[in-house]
Amino acid sequence: PGLGFY
């Protein structure tokens, strides 16, 4: 979430 992959 928010990181692109998480």
Curated annotation (Swiss-Prot):
PTM note: This is a cyclic peptide.
Any one GO biological process: defense response
Q: Which UniProt keywords apply?
A: Plant defense
Top-level taxon of origin = Eukaryota
Q: Cross-link Cyclopeptide (Pro-Tyr): give the residues.
A: P1-Y6
State its role: Probably participates in a plant defense mechanism. Has cytotoxic activity against human nasopharyngeal carcinoma with an IC(50) of 17 nM.
The entry's protein name is Cyclopeptide E
Which organism does this record belong to?
A: Annona cherimola (Custard apple)
Q: What is the lineage of its organism?
A: Eukaryota, Viridiplantae, Streptophyta, Embryophyta, Tracheophyta
